[in-house]
């Protein structure tokens, strides 16, 4: 499945039992009024009116529930990133169980509609036809009340899931590093265009997305910018979900320390991210125009000591080293993207 759009954007508004029943009864009454205009024998007309009422109510309720099913993607067929988001935000098992309740109710209401329509056709009096229709309405109300908790759950889930960020199915670089190290400036300089801002769970700042040709660059303010011990379990899961998005991590170090964090603190965060993500890491030492060469060499040595091999020296502000960085990111991200796609295809074949 393509990641061209958030797969939950098309989920329709979830009507609660009273709302859905009111809608169905209004539609049923409208159809009944049309039927009452027909010139028919009184018993035949009574059957005709009540049968069409029942069929209309059944159709409105069953179709509405089925529409929710049809417009909601099967979770297990989603890209891993979105599967993780469903698990973090609402729980996959609870979500699937609730969608199952919609299916059960839709099928049962449709079946009952057909059964009661047949019974009404055989009614011996208008009163009997009306009684059967009322009985049917009562059973539909009971079914909807039975799945009320699941309807409420899916309504809340929809609100959370429809605002998930939209990512394209492209080689993706996720940018990390402490606040004020130059991530936003670098993203704008590398992509050379307006940056899209997407919402993301557990951060009020949103996710910034830009593109270098066919490379997707994702900046995550509020997520990969502080130590993991400051996170709760759900925030950690939201961060871990990025594992399924990132083909490459670009970690920014502020050589000047003007960001307010020492080199040691920045490298400690880098080590945490290195342990957390399976994607390779490129480190860009930023603001090299503000420190001497000796200081940059010291930082390079410290990075090599923690196992970082891909190190580039840049100044996002002064446009130093950005072309080389851009080319390295493209080359590595595309290579890793193709490798990940190959692994996904092999997984599907098994």
Curated annotation (Swiss-Prot):
Q: What's the protein here called?
A: Uncharacterized protein MJ1408
Record's keyword terms, sorted? GTP-binding, Nucleotide-binding
- GO MF entry, a single one: GTPase activity
- Keyword Nucleus, does the record have it? no
CDD domains, alphabetized: NOG
Record bears the keyword Cytoplasm: no
What PANTHER family does its record include? NUCLEOLAR GTP-BINDING PROTEIN 1
Species name: Methanocaldococcus jannaschii (strain ATCC 43067 / DSM 2661 / JAL-1 / JCM 10045 / NBRC 100440)
Domain OBG-type G, first and last residues per copy: 171-334
Entry binding sites for GTP: 177-184, 219-223, 286-289
What are the top taxonomic ranks of the organism?
Archaea, Methanobacteriati, Methanobacteriota, Methanomada group, Methanococci
Family designation: Belongs to the TRAFAC class OBG-HflX-like GTPase superfamily. OBG GTPase family. NOG subfamily.
